[in-house]
């Protein structure tokens, strides 16, 4: 009986320890369009797993999001079909990845607020502050 209790306890610890809360929620094009139509305010990360700059920047971004308890959304542009990508670009035109776009009430106020490319932790924090995500 004690072995069973120990085994179950170890399983619970293992499962709880492996659960990783992500502050980046991946959404698809339809979910993105719904957020825009609902005039939501959110930050959108555009990147993918095969982009070397995205791979390098993601740990920096995740640490900032965790430290400041911020949740953002992600569109993985490599998962979009050509048709979907062209439709996405009618909403947001990007020149490369990673890019973070700050949407206010369903619209991007200016492209100057974006985070473009692999930037430092300090620059990431400054942009999130200037867009009202960090007080």
Language model region names:
Residues 1-4:
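Positively charged n-region of N-terminal signal peptides that target proteins for export
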Residues 14-17:
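C-terminal motif of bacterial Sec signal peptides marking the signal peptidase cleavage site
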Residues 19-32:
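Bacterial Sec signal peptide processing site at the extreme N-terminus
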Residues 33-70:
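Local sequence-structure signature of Cys/Sec-based thiol-disulfide redox active-site neighborhoods
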Residues 49-52, 78-80, 107-108:
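Solvent-exposed loop/turn segments at secondary-structure junctions
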Residues 69-85:
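Thiol-based oxidoreductase modules, predominantly thioredoxin-like and allied folds used
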Residues 89-103:
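Structural micro-motif
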Residues 101-135:
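Non-catalytic, surface beta->alpha helical segment in thiol-disulfide oxidoreductase systems
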């Amino acid at each position: 009986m004690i072995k069973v209790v120990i085994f179950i306890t170890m399983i619970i610890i293992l499962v709880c320890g492996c659960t990783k809360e992500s502050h980046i929620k991946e959404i698809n094009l339809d979910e993105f369009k719904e957020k825009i139509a609902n005039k939501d305010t959110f930050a959108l990360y555009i990147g993918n797993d095969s982009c070397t700059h995205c791979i390098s920047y993601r740990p920096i971004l995740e640490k900032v999001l965790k430290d400041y308890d911020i949740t953002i959304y992600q569109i993985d542009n490599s998962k979009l079909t050509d048709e979907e990508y062209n439709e996405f670009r009618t909403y947001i035109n990007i020149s490369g990845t990673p890019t973070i776009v700050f949407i206010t009430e369903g619209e991007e106020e200016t492209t100057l607020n974006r985070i473009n490319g692999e930037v430092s932790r300090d620059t990431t924090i400054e942009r999130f502050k200037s867009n009202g995500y960090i007080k």
